[in-house]
Amino acid sequence: FTGFDTDRTMLRISAMNLMLHSITHPKIEYKDSVSKQNDISGKYDVILANPPFKGTIDAESIHDNLKNVTNTKKTELLFLALFLRMLKKGGRCACIVPDGVLFGSSKAHQSIRREIIENNQLRAVISMPSGVFKPYAGVSTAVLVFTRTGAGGTDQVWFYDMKADGFSLDDKRSEIAEN
């Protein structure tokens, strides 16, 4: 198990969580994942991620090979490019993205989608309702599931529209009894 963050509190919480689940030697590092200091490539079999979105990063600090995939400062696109780079061939990723990744019209949005479908196998797109991450974020999100293959593929993509998750979609996120 490996993880990176620039928030030391999140690093401690992550390490404690892994230890509580009997993961004895996690590799949790203080590192800016999309910066030039992170040059990991083709290393991981599985990536599960809820990357930061709706943010930007200083262009000078972004690793050049991420800019080659999608020339942007938007975190939600840079992290997708990072996951594609870090996966081994045959490696799988499931990550949460804002709907803008799916529907954005900028060149950066188009280039990351093109990379996913032309050079990887898109397996699933799971649309989630806008309140599922409240009170932290109120945007509509989706889970993208893909496999790094080196060749494109969208012939068997599972699409699912999740209407609810068993909790109210307001800021209180109360459990719904009839579930």
Name these PLM-found stretches:
Residues 41-179:
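A conserved structural/catalytic subdomain of Rossmann-like adenosyl-cofactor enzymes
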Residues 6-42:
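S-adenosyl-L-methionine
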